[in-house]
Amino acid sequence: MTILNHTLGFPRVGLKRELKKAQESYWAGNSTQEELLNVGRELRARHWQQQQQAGVDLVPVGDFAWYDHVLTTSLLLGNVPERHQNADGSIDIDTLFRIGRGRAPTGKPAAAAEMTKWFNTNYHYMVPEFQQGQQFKLGWTQLLDEVDEALALGHKIKPVLLGPITYLWLGKVKGEQFDRLSLLNDILPVYQQVLAELAKRGIEWVQIDEPALVLELPQEWLDAYQPAYQALQGQVKLLLTTYFDSIGHNIDTIRALPVQGLHVDVVAGHDDLAVLNKNLPKEWLLSLGVINGRNVWRADLSSWFERLQPLVNSRPLWLGSSCSLLHSPIDLNEETRLDAEVKSWFAFALQKCAELALLTQALNAPNDAKLAELAAYSAPIRARRSSSRVHNAQVEQRLAAITSQDIERQLPYEARAETQRKRFNLPAWPTTTIGSFPQTTEIRGLRLDFKQGRLDGKNYRTGISEHIKHAIAEQERLGLDVLVHGEAERNDMVEYFGEHLDGFVFTQNGWVQSYGSRCVKPPVIIGDISRPEAITVEWAKYAQSLTEKPVKGMLTGPVTILCWSFPREDVSRETIAKQIALALRDEVEDLEKAGIGIIQIDEPALREGLPLRRADWQAYLQWAVDAFKLNAAVAQNDTQIHTHMCYCEFNDIMDSIAALDADVITIETSRSDMELLESFEDFAYPNEIGPGVYDIHSPNVPSVEWIEALLRKAAQRIPAERLWVNPDCGLKTRGWPETRQALANMVLAAQRLREEQV
């Protein structure tokens, strides 16, 4: 039996981020809808061609999205929230953009749909909204149109469709509460119609994505799979597709389904292939996701060959990417500045397609020449294991020497708080900000000129110093109590630290989509992490010299740096996090020596690092909390440690939040009208809290009365003596006029509350 290969999806944005540029040009009114549609057509044609040329047997169609593939599925099903609908009930690309971003060149602006993380990745999807009794119909034929496009170009294709149960699982009920699973029978006819249309076009296989099957689903959701797929069978062959984790715990549900094939993620999952092979119906096709779609490392193809060869001829087999290549940069050949040795360790999306082709050829026709080719390809990644760029004996020794004392502050919070009160003598309702101030065109230009060599170090430092001086003066004038230096020198909260730590490398074009038109360029962790010299001390010390008020030192925490980077695969995530923590621990010590008495360690990614299955949470939370404490615990008792987190859900990890033992935690609460504080109240959270009093993502300026009302609401849940007053996030993306006005109102609200206590 000949083995075929396929990818589960390909990056959409284009090598030069063409899609992003076309979207933003269209949104700004600088180009027409037809020009935007043409860019999409060109990108799809290029990406299909590139995959085919790299040796992919079946190219995916339906993985392209104008904003997000879950949103595309909503439109396919005719699921458009009332506030975003066209008057005539039609659906067009502006409907899609209004759901995604709240506005489009046509139609009335309305609140965008909620956005959240796609499983445990750094990609975000638009959350489908469901109402009782809503109707579904085939409303947006993008998938069928793109299938026609690809067939006209002569490609062998495999359409991709998000499965009905995962789609419902990912959504939220709006308005009157009901069980959204009850909508299953209403959406299945649309799926049947789509599959019938694909069958008419001669499609043999459809990839139907059900990643919810890697989760610990409630029994009623598992029970829904059988009747759902009974309704969908018969028109085309269905490849039930899972990714991001193992499926062993749901294997009984899966193997009873009337489908013709199953895709499993062999990279992130830990399913025993021999057992899996034995447990599946013998006539099923088994697709093995062996090339990691979520990271940038070259595959050890020789190892995969040895592991897979026993399965050849046991059943129909395909080889695939572990998940969509959406999470990978596009082409390593564009990286002209990477060190040659380091570059030899990487593979981006196009290289991953070539890896699939090479491995497939070797398994289909194994001979000495093919095995030698696999060995030659795998040699760099094997040589990496002993590279001096990877291993640092001092870091490894220091990691091994960590004791329980290293992760505990000297005194408990109550005793520390007393010494901190004496040191800082802050008023009731102390005011502060989260860290960053507006990144003006001037600031960005200064950094770019320095990076590209148009500005020397001395003039760059002079320029940054002026911006810090301005930020301190603004805060003094506003009357804030604890100041920040404003982070003018920082491009990104992770990239900035990665650039100053050994063990990281950066790409020129390693862009991946985060959501909509937003792309990120994550650093790559290639080896043991250490800090060659102080990172933030110079600027913090300078800022503190300008004022009598305390200035916070600002660090990004170890778990966030890990989660927002491409990590190593040869050591555990725990090891990486603790190496970063040790490096930043030295930074805490140096900040203290420089006279900085308040140090903030941001961990916005602590919750998103959680494993998909709750059974694995405790182990993760244990080392994540330990990494934070290892970073912070070197601080003296009178040094106040702050942390900042922005999530919508604390209840289920409250124990771990408390275990961080930060003296002050600032959180994002403004959009939830302080409801998030219920978690802290119910838990009787012992330390100090700064609930965000206004939403920095909006240009709207909150009134003094509105902020005051929120603070009163907070004081009903948390004792006033433990409350801080702050925005809910950094102010980097805002302009100075609304920043000044909002902070002035915030300070005035705090002053009014203080006066009541006198």
From Swiss-Prot:
Pathway: Amino-acid biosynthesis; L-methionine biosynthesis via de novo pathway; L-methionine from L-homocysteine (MetE route): step 1/1
Classification via NCBIfam families: met_syn_B12ind, PRK05222.1
Pfam assignment, any one: Meth_synt_2
Purpose of the protein: Catalyzes the transfer of a methyl group from 5-methyltetrahydrofolate to homocysteine resulting in methionine formation.
EC number(s) reported in the record: 2.1.1.14
Reactions it catalyzes: 5-methyltetrahydropteroyltri-L-glutamate + L-homocysteine = tetrahydropteroyltri-L-glutamate + L-methionine
Protein name: 5-methyltetrahydropteroyltriglutamate--homocysteine methyltransferase
